[in-house]
Amino acid sequence: MSAAEADRWAWLLVLSFVFGCNVLRILLPSFSFFMSRVLQKDAEQESQMRAEIQGMKQELSTVNMMDEFARYARLERKINKMTDKLKTHVKARTAQLAKIKWVISVAFYILQAALMVSLIWKYYSVPVAVVPSKWITPLDRLVAFPTRVAGGVGITCWILVCNKVVAIVLHPFS
């Protein structure tokens, strides 16, 4: 396939990249959740701590406060200490989860921006598609930017149109 033939299919290339990026953006929360589960193994420890607290609370309910005050108070302090430890653990895990999601989102958007910039760079002077100039007469210079080809659709306009169309098509799935 020659360069001229490849340039004829540029509209499909850009459309597929935009579609792929939008699909990935929809799947980003699920991917972030999966990655956080893979990277964090603390959920088992938290469930074990919750089970211990529940067991101590059941034991506390069987102890008579009037007859065995020392044991009751000791058990209550132990429950409070374990609960505080669990809360601290959950806060740390939640902060780490937010950090993981943020890093994944930033990496995705940087990758998407780099992809779009590379497409704009490659097709800067070549029209992505050529249509009869009558179809776009009032806006032909704007639509053709930066190619300056009569009836041509420039890469920037094509990316904007593709983003809008793909967003409308994928809206029910998000």
Curated annotation (Swiss-Prot):
UniProt topological domain (Lumenal) ranges: 1-8, 121-148
GO biological processes: tail-anchored membrane protein insertion into ER membrane
Gene Ontology CC annotation, any one: endoplasmic reticulum membrane
Keyword terms of this UniProt record: Coiled coil, Endoplasmic reticulum, Membrane, Transmembrane, Transmembrane helix
Interaction with GET3/TRC40: annotated span: 39-97
TM spans (from-to): 9-29, 100-120, 149-169
Any Pfam family: CHD5
Keyword Transmembrane: yes
Compartments, record wording: Endoplasmic reticulum membrane
Membrane disposition: Multi-pass membrane protein
Coiled coil: 39-94
GO molecular function: protein-membrane adaptor activity
Membrane side Cytoplasmic: residue ranges: 30-99, 170-174
UniProt xrefs under PANTHER family: GUIDED ENTRY OF TAIL-ANCHORED PROTEINS FACTOR 1 (PTHR42650:SF1), TAIL-ANCHORED PROTEIN INSERTION RECEPTOR WRB (PTHR42650)
Assembly notes: Component of the Golgi to ER traffic (GET) complex, which is composed of GET1/WRB, CAMLG/GET2 and GET3. Within the complex, GET1 and CAMLG form a heterotetramer which is stabilized by phosphatidylinositol binding and which binds to the GET3 homodimer. Interacts with CAMLG (via C-terminus). GET3 shows a higher affinity for CAMLG than for GET1.
Function: Required for the post-translational delivery of tail-anchored (TA) proteins to the endoplasmic reticulum. Together with CAMLG/GET2, acts as a membrane receptor for soluble GET3/TRC40, which recognizes and selectively binds the transmembrane domain of TA proteins in the cytosol. Required to ensure correct topology and ER insertion of CAMLG.
Family from the record: Belongs to the WRB/GET1 family.
This protein's name: Guided entry of tail-anchored proteins factor 1
Species: Bos taurus
Gene name of the record: GET1
